[in-house]
């Protein structure tokens, strides 16, 4: 299986601009990418990063500490292939689907809660000529596996519903993958809560995920007000 | 397994008051309860409703059309036992845990996306003397299975983290159940989006869930603005 991780290298995570500066958003996006790449390699697959611009995984990714169950041929993070395609997400992903000669998995780079277990379930899902989708909040397509040669993505709007419809049109059986972890993408300040709550369960070694660690370094902590949990940032 | 569904019968879903009147909130809460009870009965378990006040399931629940895989002894919705306990949620649930002589599952009544498959996975999770929790957004405890005799709940705040800590204190192994469907409780207007997106996959018969149908009857439809999906209400 060809596992592709699209990554917006240039202006990542603009919806977090209320709480994070541009360099902080870049650092957080890199930490999430590193967590996602680690989780994928721990399933035994070698991911390909589909980046909007050239990217050094060795120096900017902080994913040099790959899991011990690294797939053959992957010695360090710098061995993870990076494909540069500066087109919008949908066009870049469809180029990957068109060129593919094997099943393709597309895993978003901001699935900071992704675990090897959740990804393994995803990769094993879907019929031999079908499509499997892990939906996100608001009808997003957070991760999918494409085994039908004619399936193409369109990430605009409620893409999960559009992808269901498209799959039905081309006769591709569609399976919905039920995962809270894959369903949680980090786009908005409220999503940071999930990283801090679940970050310690995400890392394979029982430690904390890179994303959670980075958030704490930036001063974020959980805060409970009126029975509801939010994040607060200490800028001292 | 004793499956308990706590239900706030009197003033349900106050956080939806921006978009729904009190009688509409009551109707929506009843539809969600009916969907949850149907999904539980389809797993072969007889749920008990733990209600804050007396409740007629036959006339107010719209769950008279039980699934065909109804457990033995459950002929109609009016056979679903209702226990009335007007104490706050935590106290009422802990009374159930204290009295239990078998494993107890607590499933919130607003898990409108719950499917028999997701619930079956939950019910089968957790060690013989442990606890299994399906967390919700913001660290909530949306559903759990308790097999350790000393485990007690506390639903205030980030209850998922508190429950993890409590389980560790009493030596109960804790398993986190990874489910988008069980992780989605319907509390706020933004959650209604999920009901409309996934409602058609939720009903066992391939139709639409009662909750989604009720929302459409109330005039709610999905709306895509700037690539993001919200609900809009047509009050005409």
Swiss-Prot record, chains A, B:
It catalyses: (2S)-2-phospholactate + GTP + H(+) = (2S)-lactyl-2-diphospho-5'-guanosine + diphosphate. Its EC number is 2.7.7.68. The keyword Transferase applies. Guanylyltransferase that catalyzes the activation of (2S)-2-phospholactate (2-PL) as (2S)-lactyl-2-diphospho-5'-guanosine, via the condensation of 2-PL with GTP. It is involved in the biosynthesis of coenzyme F420, a hydride carrier cofactor. Transmembrane segments: none annotated. It holds the Pfam family CofC. Belongs to the CofC family. This is 2-phospho-L-lactate guanylyltransferase. Pathway: Cofactor biosynthesis; coenzyme F420 biosynthesis. It comes from Natrialba magadii (strain ATCC 43099 / DSM 3394 / CCM 3739 / CIP 104546 / IAM 13178 / JCM 8861 / NBRC 102185 / NCIMB 2190 / MS3) (Natronobacterium magadii). One of its GO terms (molecular function) is GTP binding. It is an enzyme of class 2 (transferase). Homodimer. GO terms for biological process: F420-0 metabolic process. The lineage of its organism: Archaea, Methanobacteriati, Methanobacteriota, Stenosarchaea group, Halobacteria. PANTHER family: 2-PHOSPHO-L-LACTATE GUANYLYLTRANSFERASE. Keywords: GTP-binding, Nucleotide-binding, Nucleotidyltransferase, Transferase.
């Amino acid at each position: 299986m060809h596992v592709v991780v699209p990554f917006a290298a240039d202006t990542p995570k603009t919806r977090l601009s209320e709480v994070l500066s541009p360099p902080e958003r870049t650092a957080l996006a890199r930490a999430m990418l590193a967590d996602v790449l680690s989780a994928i390699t721990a399933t035994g697959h070698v991911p390909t990063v589909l980046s909007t611009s050239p990217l050094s995984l060795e120096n900017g990714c902080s994913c040099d500490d790959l899991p011990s169950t690294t797939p053959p041929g992957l010695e360090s993070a710098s061995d993870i292939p990076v494909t540069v395609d500066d087109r919008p997400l949908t066009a870049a992903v469809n180029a990957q689907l068109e060129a593919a000669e094997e099943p393709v998995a597309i895993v978003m780079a901001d699935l900071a809660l992704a675990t090897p277990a959740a990804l393994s379930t995803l990769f094993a899902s879907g019929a031999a000529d079908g499509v499997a989708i892990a939906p996100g909040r608001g009808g997003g397509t957070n991760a999918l596996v494409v085994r039908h040669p004619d399936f193409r993505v369109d990430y605009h709007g409620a893409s999960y519903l559009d992808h269901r419809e498209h799959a039905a049109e081309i006769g591709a059986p569609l399976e919905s993958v039920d995962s809270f972890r894959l369903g949680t993408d980090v786009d908005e300040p409220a999503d940071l809560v999930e990283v801090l709550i679940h970050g310690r369960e995400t890392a394979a070694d029982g430690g904390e995920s890179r994303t959670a660690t980075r958030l704490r370094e930036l001063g974020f902590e959980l805060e409970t007000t009126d029975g509801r949990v939010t994040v607060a940032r200490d800028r001292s």
